[in-house]
Amino acid sequence: MSMQNTANTIEELELLDFTFGGDAFGRLADGKPVFVPFGLPGELVRVQIPQEKPDYCLGRLVEILTPSPKRIQARCPHFTECGGCHYQHLAYEHQLEVKHKIVTDQMRRIGKIIEPAVNPVVPSAAEWNYRNTMQFHLSPSGKPGFKDITGERVVEITECHLPVPGVNEVWPNLDIEAGIGINRVMLRAGTDGDVLAGLEGALDRPPELKLDMPISLHYLGRGQDFLMAGDAYSVMTVNGVDFTVSPRSFFQVNLPQAEAMVKYVLANCGATHESTVLDLYCGVGLFSRFLAPLVTALAGVELSESACNDFALNLDAFDNVSLYVGKVEDIASSIEIHPDLVILDPPRAGLDKRVVAYLAESTAKRLVYVSCDPATLARDCKRLTAGGFSIESIQPFDLFPQTFHVETVVLMSQA
């Protein structure tokens, strides 16, 4: 198997293992690690090395001299050129093994847990066509695509096997004139199948567009958003509950796995009718909506204005719920409740040190930490255990087949 070679420096090496981020890695003769996208451990390869960094090298696969027996044919012709997928060359059961090992390694190396007891990864029911939301970049000619692995250019695509059918029926028909200020298009399919498009641009007002598809259309501008056609929001149904989700609000892209994760949290968080719950980074209320009818009081904290508005709609029926708007690290210590259960679902950057300090000093006896980044999760678990919490369980969920991403739920308690 050969790939385009544009560099002057070529090295032959054996790939040793996977790293978090999807790359395989090997070592040069001097021991310096080389990170190689789309390689597999055990393969003997030739890689180009355009430039050496002080502590590592980034390599590009030129030729596979000895392929791994685990290597399979990728489904998508854009694989290795488009940066959206990382593991299409690996059968799904092996993808799950890699993700389990990555979570375990991060907990051991960064979290300093000697023997992390990581449960088997909960697999996705669908390996393909599972994403209800997609972000398409536009090429200079206005065609949809994704950034390449360098993030420097947009690769125009003719097919994609990650979106749900509703999204896949729309994106190939996107025809946006180049140079009118639109740089990205978000497509989201609600549970009812209705598709909402969010056009992201740098202009204050939307350009003139002709809509010839039965979809809802929003312009997400620099200072203001505009509803141009159709519905103001999508409806996403999780475990029989409908959620209002606006175009700028985050929601889990794999609904069946979101349902599994919610069920797991509810079954293991220890919430009772006497519980007081604090839901930090609560988003549109995915966990709060199911906890609110079970507990005495619940408070959510969220920075996103769009998500806060959706949270208010989704939790409107409950008198025991309050919402605090702002950065968690700025306002957590001033919240006027004394939680015994805290739900954490932060962005990839994880917890600010001030949040960790607040939790260590709080009345919380149980934490549920939902993470999309094993490295920052491991770092935060180390800090939280130093603050008096102990880890009860580590449960990964695969919400993102064909990619290196993995969601992990960690249950923690404090005496």
Regions found by a protein language model. Give the residues of each.
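Terminal RNA-binding accessory module
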Residues: 1-78
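Rossmann-like S-adenosyl-L-methionine
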Residues: 2-12, 20, 24, 177, ...
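Short, acidic/hydrophobic/Gly-rich beta-strand patch recurrent on exposed beta strands
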Residues: 24-29, 145-149, 198, 311
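Short acidic-glycine loop/turn motifs at beta-strand connectors
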Residues: 29-30, 53, 138-143, 149-151, ...
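Extended interfacial segments that mediate partner engagement and assembly in macromolecular machines
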Residues: 62-74, 80-182
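Short, solvent-exposed loop/turn elements at beta->coil junctions and helix N-caps
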Residues: 119-126, 187-188, 223-225, 396-399
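Carbohydrate-binding surface patches
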Residues: 187-202
